[in-house]
Amino acid sequence: MAFLRNLKAVKGSSRVEVYGMPQWRNFEAIEPEYLTALNVHISSAAYLDYSMPSVKAFQQAFYEATGTLPDEDGFNGYDITLFTGKMLRQFGLSFPGRLSSQVFRGLRGDLRFAPVYTTTVPDDRSNQYDYLENMFVHILKFDKYGFVPVGN
């Protein structure tokens, strides 16, 4: 990317942090040297740590059942199904009303739902939200060989 190349050239010894788009994670044309030198960060709804025992166990079970390794949709489906099952067991059919009070840590990330109001009339929130949205997001930084969660 010309932008990163030019920024690296003009930054000199100054410390710079660049916040990019989640799509940058899959750009093979971006040199790792630029990502490191410019302290590139991106946001992501998901991050899989393949060294975690729970991720390895799911991969093994999925492979034994299907003969192939799970893709991103497989991990997402597992997390959503497990979360929904736990909510049903704990709250029964009334679980949708409890979504915003529960946090679930899945293989790909957390589920932290919050109500979203789209009404244009202020104070017209008579407990009727328009929908729930997962507010959790990973902030990833480039560290030598790939993107990792900030703090690791």
Label each residue range with its predicted role:
Residues 1-152:
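Extracytosolic ligand-binding ectodomains
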